[in-house]
Curated annotation (Swiss-Prot):
Its main location: membrane. It is a multi-pass membrane protein. It comes from Escherichia coli O9:H4 (strain HS). This is L-rhamnose-proton symporter. GO terms for molecular function: rhamnose transmembrane transporter activity; symporter activity. Keywords: Cell inner membrane, Cell membrane, Membrane, Sugar transport, Symport, Transmembrane, Transmembrane helix, Transport.
Amino acid sequence: MSNAITMGIFWHLIGAASAACFYAPFKKVKKWSWETMWSVGGIVSWIILPWAISALLLPNFWAYYSSFSLSTLLPVFLFGAMCGIGNINYGLTMRYLGMSMGIGIAIGITLIVGTLMTPIINGNFDVLISTEGGRMTLLGVLVALIGVGIVTRAGQLKERKMGIKAEEFNLKKGLVLAVMCGIFSAGMSFAMNAAKPMHEAAAALGVDPLYVALPSYVVIMGGGAIINLGFCFIRLAKVKDLSLKADFSLAKSLIIHNVLLSTLGGLMWYLQFFFYAWGHARIPAQYDYISWMLHMSFYVLCGGIVGLVLKEWNNAGRRPVTVLSLGCVVIIVAANIVGIGMAN
């Protein structure tokens, strides 16, 4: 396995670790509605950071974006909005199915859809099946899916042992939302594929290969921002129990506390895709579809490890922890299989 591929896998791991941890600061926000908290974090992650970093990278910010036709920008924006819908559905999926089943189904579907649809859309799937390296990477995707399933099973055992139940368990509604979440969340993978002309243009301007995907985030995350912020602002305006004014009428020290934590959460959310771009840049072009599989499977892996570090599994007993550990090992094996396949 080449150093470039190894570093690509490593950066995807770092990005996934940030994704697994990003909600921790949000949990410490006090006396704010979820909508206010999510909006503040979202403004940081979807608007401020993509624009600021692109302004630093590009020699002429406005000239870069104005050089693209609407036919190039619109699919990138819409796939970003698609991912934003997936974000909203994610929370509802957890509500009706519970964490373990919800994450298992949603992540499993988005891993398959986001990974395999890209080469199918590009007309390259037959090449993957007909080459040794392609078959090896597809095997890695299958093994990763098995690993996600094992970690999901560990979560179910943990919830059963600790008596944790879904907020409003509804299997039919939850399954529909989980499938929708999985499909729509894959929008980020599709957006990155659609944004290739933007990446090439950034490279032509002398942007470092590690950073060429970052300017496209202005458009991708702009689509996500419209959906997420629109959802939050509509609820803040229409739901009687929610009030943006009330949330910002608290003690000044508490407002600063909440803004800083929400900002940190937004920063960590953005960093998952900052390092995703770094990892994506190191993956061989013919296997760039694998980036999504690495990100999502490492997200599950890191989520399990973070749960162990935070002692969330302390009262779950030995069997759930053993199953979780097995799932994590399987995901690591999957990453190595994919790496070997890409090296071929």
